[in-house]
UniProtKB/Swiss-Prot annotation:
This is Damage suppressor protein. It is found in: Nucleus. GO terms for cellular component: nucleus. Keywords: DNA damage, DNA-binding, Nucleus. It comes from Ramazzottius varieornatus.
Length: 445
C-alpha cells in the first residue's frame, strides 16, 4: 500500500516539497539571518506537518520529512540561539542533504530504527530541503514512509516514548517539532493546517521577534516591516535564495524580489546629496554668523545714544537686521542645496559668508537697501538708522521721526505708544477707581 500511495503522490510530493521548502522558509524563518535558516525552519515545518498527517497517509509531505535528516540538529540549537542556528543550518543542512543521496537507499534510513528516530527527532527536517529530489526516488520514499510512521508515533507522545528511544538529539528535536515544525500554515496539508495555525503565532512571537531584531541591526531598520510582510508570502525566498543571502533585502521583502534590491541601490544616492546640503547649510550658518557680528556692531548705537528709548529702538533694529541677515544665510544654504544638485552651491555660500547682499535673491536685497540708508549690507543700514537717531535731539517724538532705519522707526513708534499708554493707565485703569473713595462708594451702591 505504501508503495502505491507513494507512486501516486510522488510527483505532487516532489513539487510540494519544493514549495514547502520555499513557503516554509518564508513563513517561519526567513526573518532569521539567512535564507538557509529560513529553509531550515520551513522544512521543519514541513516535517511537522508530516508528523501530524503524513505518517498515516504516506503523502508527499511525509516524504519530505523522511528525506531530510539534518535539520533536527539545527532545530536543537534554534530555540536557544537563532544566530548559531542559522550558521549551523547552512553547514548541517548542506552536508546532510548530500548524505541522504550518498546513503543511496533511504531504505537504510527506514530500516535502521536509529535513523528513523533521528527523523522523528527532527533531523529529517534538515533534509526536507532536498526532499523534492529525494522523494523522486521511489525506494527512498518507501523507506521515508516507514520513517514517517515512526515520527508520527513519536510526535503524538512527544514528551514520552520518542524521547526515551531516540538519541540525545531527540530531546531538543522533539521540542523543535512541537514548536517550530508546524509553523507554516500554507505548507501543511489541509488536515494539519489547524495545528499549524496555532503554532505559527507562538513560534513567530518567540523566534520571529528575535530574527526581526537581527535583521534590523544588519539592514538598518527597514527590514523589520519587510520581514513581517515577507513571512506571510510564499514568494520571497522562492527562486532567488542566493540573492536573498547576498543582499539580505530580497529575502525579507514581501515577495517583490526585484524591487527590494532596487531600494538598496536607490538608498545609496541620497546620502551624497545630503552631504552636499549639509555643507551648504554649514556655509549658510557661517554667513549668518558673520551677519550676527554685524548686527552686534549695530548695537554700538545703543550706548552712543543717551536716550533709553532710542537705545531700545536701535537694538530692536539690530535684531530685525539679524533676522534678515539670517535669511541671507538661508539663501546661502539653499544655494548650496542647489549646488548639491547642480554644482553651484559653493560660490553662493562664499558670497553670503562675506556679508555681501548680492548673494541674496534680488527681492530680499532690494528690501534691505530701501529700508536702510542705501548701503548694501544689513548691519550698515542698522548703524545708519541708529546714528541718525542718536545725533538728533533725544526727545521721543524726534527719535521717532529721525529713526528712519525701517525696523528702528517702527520700534521707536511702538516704544512711545507704550510709554504714553503707561502714563495714562493710572487715571483710566481700574486701579484709579479703587483708590478714589467716592468712586469706590458709587461702585458699591
Amino acid at each position: 500500500m505504501a508503495s502505491t500511495h507513494q507512486s501516486s503522490t510522488e510527483p505532487s510530493s516532489t513539487g510540494k516539497s519544493e514549495e514547502t521548502k520555499k513557503d516554509a522558509s518564508q513563513g517561519s524563518g526567513q526573518d532569521s539571518k539567512n535564507v538557509t535558516v529560513t529553509k531550515g525552519t520551513g522544512s521543519s515545518a514541513t516535517s511537522a506537518a508530516i508528523v501530524k498527517t503524513g505518517g498515516s497517509q504516506g503523502k508527499d509531505s511525509s516524504t519530505t520529512a523522511g528525506s531530510s535528516s539534518t535539520q533536527g540538529q539545527k532545530f536543537s540549537t534554534t530555540p536557544t540561539d537563532p544566530k548559531t542556528f542559522s550558521s549551523d543550518q547552512k553547514e548541517k543542512s548542506k552536508s546532510p542533504a548530500k548524505e541522504v543521496p550518498s546513503g543511496g537507499d533511504s531504505k537504510s534510513q527506514g530500516d535502521t530504527k536509529s535513523q528513523s528516530d533521528a527523523k522523528s527527532s527532527g533531523q529529517s527536517q534538515g533534509q526536507s530541503k532536498d526532499s523534492g529530489k529525494s522523494s523522486s526516488d521511489s525506494s527512498k520514499s518507501h523507506s521515508v514512509i516507514g520513517a514517517v510512521k515512526d515520527v508520527v508515533a513519536g510526535a503524538k507522545d512527544v514528551a514520552g516514548k520518542a524521547v526515551e528511544d531516540a538519541p540525545s538529539i531527540m530531546h531538543t528535536a522533539v521540542d523543535a517539532v512541537k514548536n517550530a515544525a508546524t509553523t507554516v500554515k500554507d505548507v501543511a496539508s489541509s488536515a494539519a493546517s489547524t495545528v499549524a495555525e496555532k503554532v505559527v503565532d507562538a513560534y513567530h512571537s518567540v523566534v520571529g521577534d528575535k530574527t526581526d531584531d537581527k535583521k534590523e541591526g544588519e539592514h538598518s531598520g527597514d527590514k523589520k516591516d519587510d520581514s513581517k510582510a515577507g513571512s506571510g508570502s510564499g514568494q520571497g525566498g522562492d527562486n532567488k535564495k542566493s540573492e536573498g543571502e547576498t543582499s539580505g533585502q530580497a529575502e525579507s521583502s514581501s515577495g517583490n524580489e526585484g524591487a527590494a534590491p532596487a531600494k538598496g541601490r536607490g538608498r545609496g544616492r541620497p546620502p551624497a546629496a545630503a552631504k552636499g546640503v549639509a555643507k551648504g547649510a554649514a556655509k549658510g550658518a557661517a554667513a549668518s554668523k558673520g551677519a550676527k557680528s554685524g548686527a552686534e556692531s549695530s548695537k554700538g548705537g545703543e550706548q552712543s545714544s543717551g536716550d533709553i528709548e532710542m537705545a531700545d529702538a536701535s537694538s530692536k533694529g539690530g535684531s530685525d537686521q539679524r533676522d534678515s541677515a539670517a535669511t541671507v544665510g538661508e539663501g546661502g544654504a539653499s544655494g548650496s542645496e542647489g549646488g548639491a544638485k547642480k554644482g553651484r552651491g559653493r560660490g553662493a555660500g562664499k558670497k553670503a559668508d562675506a556679508g555681501d547682499t548680492s548673494a541674496e535673491p534680488p527681492r530680499r536685497s532690494s528690501r534691505l537697501t530701501s529700508s536702510g540708508t542705501g548701503a548694501g549690507s544689513a548691519p550698515a543700514a542698522a548703524k545708519g538708522g541708529a546714528k541718525r537717531a542718536a545725533s538728533s535731539s533725544s526727545t521721543p517724538s524726534n527719535a521717532k521721526k529721525q529713526a528712519t532705519g525701517g525696523a528702528g522707526k517702527a520700534a521707536a513708534t511702538k516704544a512711545t505708544a507704550a510709554k504714553s499708554a503707561a502714563s495714562k493707565a493710572p487715571q483710566n485703569g481700574a486701579g484709579a477707581k479703587k483708590k478714589g473713595g467716592k468712586a469706590g462708594g458709587r461702585k458699591r451702591k
